[in-house]
A protein has these predicted regions:
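Mature catalytic domains of secreted/periplasmic carbohydrate-active enzymes
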Residues: 20-479
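Bacterial Sec-dependent N-terminal signal peptides
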Residues: 1-22
Length: 479
């Protein structure tokens, strides 16, 4: 009997999975809410990169919603896509969006080069848009003939990137935006798009029930083929039959359980309850720290012709602007997802690569203030000296991240510079401060400081040179 008990105990200790029943998710919100909506891995990862790349990269005009704008003869749009399309390509009766597919060759696409760029940029999770509103799947699909393996590049883009990204130790991300496909373009008779053979591309000419099934089948196919660690969904999930949405989520979570995989699903406007998924804030973040960790997706594109997909002559954000957004987002309990915009041939413009490389360079030096951190009791403050500072913490360290250099000009200053932080004081800091150090210098020397119940102040010696033109980090270590 003792031998039998010992054997059972051995299996319980050594193989705990045998003694613990796996979750079996049902397609209802109560059951789905048992899922851990925000696992610790993404709270540690903090920074990811994804890419809007698809058929819309061929016309490369206005933005990634080209399929919608080209069909809108009442378009008041700032760039007149409809009239331009007619002038360049001909009437909609003879040239449809589907005619761009053979032009979408991706002849220079290299998944390893993409993944190397993501690593160089400091990303901890990464991946492609699997399908945008236009109905063209970027993976090898049996659900729709309009996919990148059978048409266009003739390659499984999602699959190649999954392999390259995981090989480099990153979590695999992908996004699905096809919930808008059915209402995105209301196809009219007389358009080339009205040909029944294009129904699964444009969506709106399908029976609604058939389209709903296709939406679900695409989601299931992506889950089963690529097992993403995180699937991002755009807005408009209310357009999807809720039974099908819950069926998909239950399948995703159950498949993850089989693989001992901690997965995440995101949505906007709580289209998926925040007890089930992670909330995404597009190009924005809360004004203060919020309890639920969130995702902020942020595009490198900016300016008048704001676009997530590549457009000719597009303006992009600087590395400073992106890093400042990352710092703010992290200080408020968020994670930043940066979008890049590759060309139709599968290459990244040099200016985008340069920005990503500079982001990675900053994170290489100051990343300890970002990765694996959690918010401090307050996200930051504007000092009386006019400095914007954000706070994060990890272990026994608190990080004060300044968006501009609080010290003096080394070529002009004759005095030391004193910095006062009202939100850091002996009441807000739980513990005794041991030291303060300015990161990024070859020789990291302790910074003189004082602390009382009202503020912390520290002195930057006049000969101290700023270690970064982007943002400076002071590490405050507790005993």
């Amino acid at each position: 009997m003792k031998v039998l008990i010992s054997i059972v105990a051995f299996y319980v200790v050594v193989f705990p999975s045998l003694s613990q029943k796996k979750a079996d998710y049902k397609p209802d919100w109560k059951s789905l809410s048992k899922h851990t909506e925000v696992p610790e891995w993404i709270r540690d990862a903090k920074f990811g990169i994804y890419c809007h790349w698809g058929v819309y990269s061929v016309p490369a005009y206005n933005n990634e919603h080209y399929i919608q704008h080209m069909h809108n003869d009442a378009e008041y749009g700032k760039l007149g896509t409809y009239k331009r399309h007619i002038a360049l390509y001909g009437p909609l009766s003879s040239f449809g969006y589907h005619d761009f597919i053979p032009m979408f060759k991706g002849e220079k696409f290299n998944a390893d080069e993409w993944a190397d760029l993501f690593v160089k940029g400091g990303a901890k999770f990464a991946g492609p848009v699997a399908e945008h509103h236009d109905g063209f799947a970027m993976w090898e699909s049996k659900v729709t003939p309009f996919n990148a393996k059978d048409m266009g590049p003739k390659r499984d883009i999602v699959g190649e990137l999954e392999v390259a990204i995981r090989k480099r130790g990153m979590k695999f991300f992908t996004s699905l935006h096809h919930e808008l496909n059915y209402t995105n373009v209301k196809v009219k008779q007389g358009w080339a798009a009205a040909d029944p053979k294009y129904a699964k591309l444009y969506g709106s000419t399908m029976k609604h029930s058939e389209w709903q099934k296709m939406w679900l089948d695409k989601c299931i196919e992506v889950v089963d083929k690529y097992h993403p660690d995180i699937i991002y969904h755009d807005a408009w999930l209310e357009q999807v039959d809720q039974d099908k949405l819950r069926t998909y989520l239950a399948h995703y979570f159950n498949e993850a359980e089989k693989r001992n995989q901690e997965v995440i699903v995101t949505s906007k406007d709580e289209d998926i309850p925040n007890t089930v998924g992670m909330e995404d804030h597009e190009n924005s973040n809360p004004e203060k720290i919020i309890e639920k960790p969130f995702l902020c997706d942020y595009s490198i594109g900016t300016g008048f012709s704001f676009s997530w997909g590549y457009t000719e002559g597009m303006q992009i954000r600087t590395e400073k602007e992106i890093i400042h957004k990352l710092i703010e987002v992290v200080s408020k309990n968020g994670q930043l997802l940066l979008n890049l915009s590759p060309r139709a041939d599968g290459t990244f413009p040099e200016d985008q690569k340069e920005v990503v490389t500079k982001i990675g360079r900053w994170l290489w030096t100051f990343g300890e203030s970002i990765y694996e951190t959690r918010p401090f009791t307050i996200f930051g403050e504007s000092t009386s000296e006019g400095h914007q500072v954000y706070y994060t913490q990890k272990g026994k360290n608190i990080y004060a991240i300044f968006l501009n250099w609080p010290g003096g000009n080394i070529d002009k200053s004759t005095n030391d510079v004193k910095v006062n932080l009202k939100e850091l004081n002996s009441q807000s800091i739980k513990g005794k401060v041991k030291s303060i150090q300015l990161l990024g210098l070859k020789s990291i020397e302790p910074v003189p400081f004082e602390i009382n119940t009202k503020e912390m102040s520290f002195t930057i010696p006049k000969k101290t040179r700023t270690p970064s033109e982007i943002a400076q980090v002071f590490r405050i270590t507790l005993e």
